[in-house]
From Swiss-Prot:
It comes from the Eukaryota. The keyword Cell inner membrane does not apply. GO terms for cellular component: cytoplasm; cytosol; mitochondrial nucleoid; mitochondrion; ribonucleoprotein granule. It is found in: Cytoplasm; Mitochondrion; Mitochondrion matrix, Mitochondrion nucleoid. This is ATP-dependent RNA helicase DHX30. The modification Phosphoserine is found at S29, S249, S403. Residues 76-144 form the DRBM domain. The lineage of its organism: Eukaryota, Metazoa, Chordata, Craniata, Vertebrata. ATP binds at G480, D481, T482, G483, C484, G485, K486, T487. Expressed in the heart, brain, spleen, lung, liver, skeletal muscle, kidney, and testis. Expression is strongest in the testis and brain, while the lowest levels of expression are found in the spleen and lung.
Length: 1217
């Protein structure tokens, strides 16, 4: 066991049991500090404003019923901030909007000082500060609207128009944001010029543009940095004004000097108060700034200033105020000479006044964490290394071995796989082909022609044209309008042509669909139309579910991902006659990747025919991509659909103006869906609309659950008369199929779906379509290297597709929750996914299919080539995690990962878990990161977070909470007690369909691991007694292996931060990654943890939201796990007695110990690397018994090391900041 200690003292074990733990890293003081800071109120005297105050009513304030104002301006602070920010080209308007608070006996008063476009003040009242602020801000919004700074619907103008409007007030906008020179010491404005400007009482007024309550988390502020980063930005300024200050008495006999000082500092008392309050974090300066005035005709004022050190200033005047102002001005002059006031005569930031404390804390942060390994464990490590020495010439391979030495693994070296059946491929003999073709012809004759038994579709008259084009050309594009029948009919037409010509056995068609539900439902529809005799010739294959057709005369419907997997084991698609790529216009990343492979496949298999089918889109572009192939256009048929837009809908609902969110859309293009409006519309349709199903398109799962809950609450006891069906990729296929079922008589079907229901599937009884106009799109930020799943407007092509869902089988109605003007602004087609998402998976797939080409070369052949920089970033990441070598060839690790169908980092974690013998919990974690097991919604997030915290116990891990949740579910399933199962799900807020899906994923990953030669048989993966699960109960090892897979996704918790206002908060924490600071999302249990066992966290994914980067899942990891299990080299500094060891590629981990301990840990790390290398180079289960025993001893030592305490994070309890 080991004890890392992060201060000068070290922890000594009391006895051999090592059961005592050091003091945990406590966050209690941080929470208390934050609360106390918000409870204080700044009582500075209000700044003296020019006499340009607006007095529209007697009394000098703008008065109007707050209820009416807030109804017109529901988010007034955001609106004010947006107007000024846009007009001045700044991101924050704090120095243009100053809120001054006054406590009344019953209500709080706020005076809002507005400094742009001219100086004016308004007042607001409320029981809370935030209410008073909002009322004042709403009054200011009314004033802005009267000045013409807001449109009739409170919409914003562009920046150019604001500059013109500002000129009318005599305050050109440009003059307000031109950078101003400042003097050393470096101010926060210099450190973050885009966010902060000097001139305001830093930290005294709340951030504008936020409507939250007083307890809003301060960590959410943009621009917050940790102490180390702040000091590195100010290191060029060695001047510490507080150290240079000296006390003294200044008897002023020369009144001219005082007059000149007063001219330089016209409001000296205010300035002194602000400086002292900011520097000392106090709400008043009275105790540190005291006046004593004597005299009758001539007043003599003595100012005693106790900060930064005792100083006295004396001045005279005819009146008391004059004398005191002169003394204060002299004090201001002295402070400026000490560097305590900037060149604009404004206070410095709180951080700059506390540089000494910052530097002291920074020095503490830079000290390495001291580790002590108990002597018994050190002796065991020495004995192991003596018995199994690591060759001195052996260097950590970083899992990046040159591919020249790699043993071929997997199916690529074996027989081809039949793409239709999945069995080993063997061509049919001539006799078998004749016999099978004759049998198919007899079955077909009994059935009769398609058009005699199935309803006539618009595509049927074009039958000969389509079939002739496919016969004569290797590639054909079919552009068919919605409802033409291309998806179900063209595969049957191909099969009919081949069968009736006596060559049916040669017809083997693979039809790809973009989604699982489409592949299954279309296969079932075609199977039904072909009839009982030919039903076995139609099949489907999707993730976790497969029903392949019989060989010869086969139609296989599958997802694009399934076909990509088939191409790995049969690169030329031998045995396939046609590939039909349906819905190619959607331009998902897998389809674009598939087109690259299919284009190259034409040389390998010239007989293969490729058909691209699209409902909408730039079909000529596909034609040019395939060398000018023919495009056949097929008109569709739709019943009439009556369309309603937002303005029509609001009129029907009796609402006479846009909801605020929709007004905001018009000005800011932001996409926030009003779930209440959606619910009201569905209820209105139900009450007054035609009978029939309602299909509602929503952006994502949270919106689906939100609308579902609102409908259930509104329907109450009448819910039995409605069938409310959510449709989302999170829901297993067996549950999604319910949307195709006809509801009982008198029951209305309401389908709540994402764009999963937009194409390929037809729900016959849908009459009404509610279109939110929104969907989720993944976008990748090259600068932050973070993905963001954003809600964005759909394209016009999407709107057409959604509208078409209402007119497939009867006349219908489409309700668009956006104005007609928005439709005109929508882009014609979606941006291809390949241009806006991370490319690691795609690059890995490229290296599997065409290893001889570089990633850039391969992806440059796409219909739309991605940004070269994005491709290079993906290659670098894969090299960092050891999947590719420097020549872009797959490493041994990369070859193993190629078998596992998930994100490369998660796949790496699975591979390492098999080697480190803790496989099952990692399979659960990876499955749960793919599909969330909890039944979370907008309404119950807090409850879900509490359940996760309980499930995690004291592990400090969201990921182990997943493991315990699934383990509990598996245990309940064994009881076969329905009541127990339901109680378990309800108590732990788990979603049964997701748990079933997770179970399927674990089964699939088990097959993948078997294919990668990591286990002897798939069932071993979940068997507790199997060798691959020997250490599955060792939680620190499990978390460490997960971290090794996810590395460099590592966080170091650091003490102290500097806010964007320049406020130094020594008792707060920041979360530092290799690429910068991030925030912990409320959904991770470590966000609200009061004690952390370790300063180091690992995470899978960071997401960007509102300009900040958040981590949603995290696990505390042992510092020795970080040292021993990560890739890359380590760096050691050894003076012969003490040594430090750190990661060469990161400054997030530095450990210190005696030279012997550090040397042994380095050798132990190399032994672990050797174990991984050996395991990757051969079948894991086939390793010699002696090697397996060696690995077993090594892992036993590692588990013992990690059972020890993770170390304490000794926090200095400073005064409240």
């Amino acid at each position: 066991m080991v004890t890392p200690v992060c201060n000068s003292s070290t922890w000594q074990p009391k006895d051999s049991s090592f059961l005592s733990w050091p003091e945990m890293f406590s966050l209690d003081s941080f929470r208390k500090d934050r609360t106390q800071h918000r409870q204080r109120q700044c009582k500075l005297p209000p700044p003296r404003l020019p006499p340009m105050c607006v007095n529209p009513a007697p009394g000098g304030t703008i008065t109007r019923a707050s209820r009416d104002l807030l109804k017109e301006f529901p988010q007034p602070k955001n609106l004010l901030n947006s107007v000024i920010g846009r007009a001045l080209g700044i991101s924050h308007a704090k120095d243009k909007l100053v809120y001054v608070h006054t406590n009344g006996p019953k209500k709080k008063k706020v005076t809002l000082h507005i400094k742009w476009p001219k100086s004016v003040e308004v007042e607001g009242y409320g029981s809370k500060k935030i209410d008073a602020e909002r009322q004042a801000a709403a009054a200011a919004c009314q004033l802005f609207k009267g000045w013409g700074l807001l449109g009739p619907r409170n919409e914003l103008f562009d920046a150019a128009k604001y500059r013109v409007l500002a000129d009318r007030f005599g305050s050109p906008a440009d003059s307000w944001w031109r950078p101003e020179p400042t003097m050393p010491p470096t101010s926060w404005r210099q450190l973050n010029p885009e966010n902060i400007r000097p001139g305001g009482p830093a930290g005294l007024s709340r951030s504008l543009g936020r409507e939250e309550e007083e307890d809003e988390e301060e960590e959410l502020e943009e621009g917050t940095i940790d102490v180390t980063e702040f000091l590195s930005m100010t290191q060029q300024d060695s001047h510490n004004p507080l150290r240079d200050s000296r006390g003294g008495s200044f008897e002023m006999t020369d009144d001219d000097s005082a007059i000149r000082a007063l001219t330089q500092f016209p409001l000296p008392k205010n300035l002194l108060a602000k400086v002292i309050q900011i520097a000392t974090s106090s709400s008043t300066a009275k105790n540190l700034m005291q006046f004593h005035t004597v005299g009758t005709k001539t007043k003599l004022a003595t100012l005693t200033l106790l900060w930064p050190c005792p100083m006295t200033f004396v001045a005279k005047g005819r009146r008391k105020a004059e004398a005191e102002n002169k003394a204060a001005a002299l004090a201001c002059k002295k402070l400026k000479s000490l560097g305590l006031v900037d060149r604009n005569n404004e206070p410095l930031t709180h951080a700059m006044y506390n540089l000494a404390s910052l530097r002291e804390l920074g020095e503490t942060q830079r000290r390495p964490c001291t580790i002590q390994v108990p002597e018994p464990i050190l002796r065991k490590i020495e004995a192991f290394l003596s018995h199994y020495p690591v060759d001195s010439s052996w260097i950590s391979p970083e899992l990046r071995l040159q591919s020249d030495d790699i043993l071929p693994l997997g199916k690529d070296s074996g027989p081809l796989s039949d793409p239709i059946t999945g069995k080993p491929y063997m061509p049919l003999s001539e006799a078998e082909e004749v016999r099978l073709s004759q049998s198919l012809l007899e079955l077909w004759r009994r059935r009769g022609p398609i058009w005699q038994e199935a309803p006539q579709l618009p595509v049927d008259p074009h039958r000969d044209t389509i079939l002739s084009a496919i016969e004569q050309h290797p590639v054909v594009v079919i552009s068919g309008d919605t409802g033409c029948g291309k998806t179900t009919r063209i595969p049957q037409l191909l099969l009919e042509r081949y069968v009736t010509e006596g060559r049916g056995a040669r017809c083997n068609v693979i039809i790809t669909q973009p989604r699982r539900i489409s592949a299954v439902s279309v296969a079932q529809r075609v199977s039904h139309e072909l009839g009982p005799s030919l039903r076995r010739n139609v099949g489907f294959q999707v993730r976790l579910e497969s029903k392949p057709p019989a060989r010869g005369g086969a139609l296989l419907f599958c997802t694009v991902g399934i076909l990509l997997r088939k191409l790995q084991s049969n690169p030329s698609l031998e045995g396939v006659s046609h590939v039909i790529v349906d819905e190619v216009h959607e331009r998902d990343v897998n389809t674009d990747f598939l087109l690259i492979l299919l284009k190259g496949l034409q040389r390998l298999n010239p007989a293969l025919r490729l058909v691209l089918m699209s409902a909408t889109g730039d079909n000529e572009r596909f034609s040019r991509y395939f060398g000018g192939c023919p495009v056949i256009k097929v008109p569709g048929f739709m019943y009439p659909v009556k369309e309603h837009y937002l303005e029509d809908i609001l009129a029907k609902l009796g609402k006479h103006q846009y909801p605020h969110r929709h007004r905001h859309h018009e000005s800011e293009d932001e996409c926030a869906l009003d779930l209440d409006l959606v619910t009201d519309l569905v209820l209105h349709i139900d009450a007054r609309g035609e009978p029939g199903g309602i299909l509602c398109f929503l952006p994502g799962w949270q919106e689906i659950k939100g609308v579902q809950q609102r409908l259930q609450e509104a329907l109450g006891m009448h819910e039995s008369k409605y069938l409310i069906l959510p449709v989302h990729s999170n829901i297993p296929m067996m549950d999604q199929k319910a949307i195709f079922q006809q509801p009982p008589l008198g029951v209305r079907k309401i389908v709540l779906a994402t764009n999963i229901a937009e194409t390929s599937i037809t729900v016959n009884d849908i009459v009404h379509v509610v279109d939110s106009g929104l969907h989720k799109e993944e976008r990748y930020d090259l600068k932050t290297k973070v993905s963001c799943l954003e809600t964005v407007w759909v394209s016009r092509a999407n709107v057409i597709q959604r509208r078409g869902r209402a007119g497939r089988c009867q006349s219908g109605f489409a309700y668009h929750l956006f104005p007609r003007s928005r439709l005109e602004k929508m882009v014609p087609f979606q941006v291809p996914e390949i241009l806006r998402t991370p490319l690691e998976n795609l690059v890995l797939q490229a290296k599997i299919h065409m290893p001889e080409k570089t990633a850039v070369e391969f992806l440059s052949k796409a219909v739309d080539s991605p940004n070269i920089k994005a491709v290079d970033e993906a290659v670098i990441l894969l090299q960092e995690i050891g999947v590719l070598d420097q020549r872009e060839y797959l490493t041994t690790l990369g070859q193993r990962l190629a078998h596992i169908s998930t994100d490369p980092r998660l796949a790496k974690a699975i591979v390492l878990a098999a080697i480190f013998r803790c496989l099952h919990p990692l399979l659960v974690v990876v499955s749960c990161l793919t599909r969330d097991p909890f039944s979370s919604s907008l309404q119950n997030r807090a409850e879900v977070d509490k359940v996760k915290a309980l499930l995690s116990h004291d592990s400090g891990s969201d990921h182990l909470a997943f493991v315990r949740a699934v383990a509990g579910w598996e245990e309940v399933l064994r009881w076969q007690d329905r009541t127990s199962r339901e109680n378990y799900l309800e108590e732990n807020l788990l979603y049964a369909p997701s748990l079933r899906f997770i179970h399927g994923l674990i089964k699939q990953f088990s097959e993948n691991i078997y294919e990668a030669f990591l286990v002897g048989k798939p069932s071993d993966c979940t068997l507790p007694s199997a060798q691959c699960n020997e250490y599955s109960e060792e939680e620190e090892l499990v978390k460490g292996v997960l971290m090794a897979g996810l590395y460099p996704n590592l966080i170091q918790v650091r003490q102290g931060k500097v806010t964007r206002q320049g406020k130094f908060k020594p008792n707060s924490v920041t979360y530092r990654t290799k690429s910068g600071n991030i925030l912990l999302h409320k959904s991770t249990i470590n966000r609200e943890a009061t004690r952390l066992r370790s300063r180091w966290l690992t995470y899978f994914m960071a997401v960007k939201s509102n300009g900040s980067v958040f981590v949603r899942d995290s696990s505390q990891v042992h510092p020795l796990a970080v040292l021993l299990l990560t890739d890359g080299d380590v760096h050691i500094r050894d003076d012969g007695r003490r040594a430090t060891i750190s990661l060469s590629d990161s400054d997030l981990l530095r450990l210190e110990g005696d030279s012997r301990t550090v040397r042994l840990l380095r050798e132990f790390r190399r032994a672990l690397g050797r174990m991984v290398e050996r395991s990757l180079r051969s079948e894991l289960a086939a390793l010699p018994l002696s090697v397996q025993q060696e690995h077993g001893q090594l892992l036993a030592l590692l588990a013992e090391l990690l059972r020890g305490p993770c170390g304490s994070f000794d926090m200095r309890k400073t005064a409240d900041d």
